[in-house]
Amino acid sequence: MWFGFAFDILARPPIVRGMFRLVIFLFLLCAGLAPLGAQSSAIPEFKSRLPMSVVFKGSEKFDRLVKRAKKENWAALPIGERTAAVGKALLGTPYVNYTLEIDDRIESASVNFDGLDCWTFYEISLAFARMLQAKDGDYRPEDLLALVELERYRNGKCDGGYLSRMHFLEEVFADNGARGLSVNPTKELGGERLSRQIREMTAMWKSYRYLRNDPSQLPEMARIQEKVSALPVYHIPKSRVASIERHLRTGDIIAITCKYPGAYTSHVGIAVKKPDGVWFMHATSKRDKGRKVILDCRISDYLKRSDENYGIVVYRPLELPKPVDVAMEKGAGR
């Protein structure tokens, strides 16, 4: 029966055969069996709970970055080199703090190219780099927002609540690692275990717009801090960093550990390998450095600038799986 039907279709005029193929494709598409080409990517769908004008700032800069990335074929670079290429393109961007505090109650992934802090600098550089690999052209702000959400929120999903965002780098590293999005080679590089009692968010809650407007979230934030305090966090003491620099890679995310007993880390940036060592690219708040994104100096030299700099954590992002919904793979907040 089916063979006869197939031969009957083949005998029809080309327009009829074309319509038949379209019907079959649409059927398979609805069944989730048809390939979508570039659309069948690792980029989850982004659904904003706030207007795009609120969650995405700097569209012209985004368009310029996309144009440059295509011209210089950044998509062909390994993930680390790609992340660093994006970071270098953002050099000179002004340092601006609290850019994630965009509403009194509703939480959403957001991107602001007009101003970056140390965390959003690495985060946007990485998300943009992943976007270039996860999709073949037609890059949209929604794609970047989706990949920021994948990195920034617990299990890769923002539920509209402030506490779905991870507010501590250590949790981001653990959560993304558990979902197969990164590795943490710090321990293998000779790292030592750190012990901290995290309390930054509850101690400084009035500094955060969402917590000021809804203090009822403080008890749950305290519970999150307890969980982060219990994570197995390793760091490489600054006295040893120069000796292990050769093992670092361009695009590694470098978190600076601190001596303060209420926090593991105080700063973060991107590693860039140069002939004379591995340099630290970061968004700095220092006025003598211009309060902007800079390619500073060797990481080991940067650590020597302050007694508060205790060491480093090395976080190595990986390429996104394709086309697996990594956001839903259960894993393990500034």
Residue spans for each PLM region:
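Cationic-aromatic interfacial patches
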Residues: 42-120, 125
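Short, well-ordered loop/turn sites that connect or cap secondary structure elements
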Residues: 247-248
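Boundary at the C-terminal end of the N-terminal hydrophobic targeting segment
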Residues: 36-40
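Acidic/His-rich structured neighborhood in mature extracellular/periplasmic domains
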Residues: 90-231, 273, 282-285
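C-terminal soluble interaction/assembly domains
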Residues: 254-320, 328
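Bacterial N-terminal signal peptides
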Residues: 23-32
